[in-house]
């Protein structure tokens, strides 16, 4: 009652609370909604998601510096960049965040909210759990993500911490994030080369997804139903898309889908039908909080880009980002500022290098 009742009334119970334990507890509310049908729990989850993503969240999708929720509108996320290196309890937090997003997608009837939940799940995956320092066989495990002015990925000082368990659970859940079935068809939530086979009525259908996303903008789906069948295929169109996404079927344009919604394709599908989705990506800036709009993260598509091996702290130096960043290698961009070259790469590509996550907008 201390969590779900205030959330259902639109209140914010999070400030000062332990971050992970409260987010993972939200999944019990999802189970209550699915079992009892009480809309209180559905409303509570929707409000919790809104609060987490608009008042607590770093650009990576992480939250809870020092494992504690901040008080919104006081600039505390910004302050934490200088006061701690423990910005997100990553394996546990990503496990809780992705589990919550899956429940919300399952129970959403609003295509815009469905897309929003999928967008954030994708953000969390790429920039937190997939961006940790790789564990080793000796029990050295990542625990916290660090977003300090000059940051470094390190292991937790003790072997086999609690997060070593949730890291494995999160990895095991990767396939659960890709596709969602419904009585009318299939929803594609994430874009990664994969294959799914399912029963739709009396037909068996296989969908094969091929892509180099997010390094590239295009995703291809090939369908293999064992008989002609009508069903609906929906594709998430991220809100960050630089323009409308284009969809072709068997090479013929069929729809331009607006960012932040779903592309809905209902037709009579046959063996070998091919769907091609192109999602335009471009750089954008995201402020750390509402008190510090000049302190920004550099984003492209679902990915947070960081400055690699900075020779000095860049957080206070005004930079004209995104400016005219030059593409010098796959997912690697560069620009010259004040006579020196700065390299920008996705946070998930960093292992042993130092990096900067937030910059001052020029």
In which residue ranges do the predicted regions lie?
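Well-ordered alpha-helical segments within folded domains of soluble proteins
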Residues: 17-34, 86-105, 164-174
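Structural helix-adjacent loops and short alpha-helical linkers that scaffold large soluble proteins
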Residues: 33-46, 53, 104-119, 227
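Long, well-ordered core segments of solenoidal/helical folds
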Residues: 1-9, 44-61, 123-134
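Extracellular Ig-like/FN3 beta-sandwich strand-entry sites
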Residues: 230, 272-274
């Amino acid at each position: 009652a201390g969590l779900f009742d205030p959330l259902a009334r639109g209140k914010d119970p999070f400030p000062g609370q332990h971050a992970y334990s409260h987010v993972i507890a939200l999944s019990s509310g999802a189970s209550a909604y699915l079992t009892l049908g009480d809309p209180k729990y559905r409303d509570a989850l929707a409000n919790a998601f809104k609060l987490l993503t608009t008042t607590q969240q770093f650009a990576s999708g992480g939250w809870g510096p020092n494992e504690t929720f901040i008080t919104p509108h006081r600039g505390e996320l910004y302050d934490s960049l200088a006061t701690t290196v423990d910005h997100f309890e990553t394996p546990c937090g990503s496990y809780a965040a992705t589990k919550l997003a899956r429940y919300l997608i399952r129970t959403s009837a609003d295509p815009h909210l469905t897309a929003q939940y999928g967008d954030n799940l994708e953000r969390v995956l790429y920039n937190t759990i997939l961006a940790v320092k790789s564990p080793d066989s000796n029990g050295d495990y990542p625990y916290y993500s660090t977003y300090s002015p000059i940051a470094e990925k390190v292991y937790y000082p003790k072997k086999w911490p609690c997060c070593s368990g949730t890291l494995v659970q999160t990895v095991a859940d990767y396939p659960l994030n890709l596709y969602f079935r419904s009585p009318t068809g299939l929803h594609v939530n994430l874009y990664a080369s994969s294959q799914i086979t399912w029963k739709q009525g009396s037909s068996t259908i296989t969908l094969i997804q091929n892509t180099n996303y997010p390094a590239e903008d295009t995703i291809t789906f090939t369908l293999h139903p064992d008989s002609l069948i009508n069903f609906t295929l929906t594709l998430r169109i991220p809100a960050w898309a630089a323009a409308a996404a284009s969809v072709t079927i068997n090479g013929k344009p069929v729809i331009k889908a607006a960012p932040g919604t779903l592309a809905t394709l209902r037709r009579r599908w046959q063996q070998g039908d091919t769907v091609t989705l192109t999602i335009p990506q471009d750089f954008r800036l995201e402020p750390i909080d509402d008190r510090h709009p000049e302190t920004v993260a550099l984003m492209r598509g679902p990915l947070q880009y960081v400055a690699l091996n900075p020779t000095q702290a860049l957080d206070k130096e005004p930079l004209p980002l995104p400016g005219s960043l030059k593409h010098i290698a796959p997912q690697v961009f560069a620009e010259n500022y004040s006579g020196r070259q700065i390299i920008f790469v996705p946070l998930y590509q960093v292992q042993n290098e130092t990096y900067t996550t937030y910059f001052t907008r020029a």
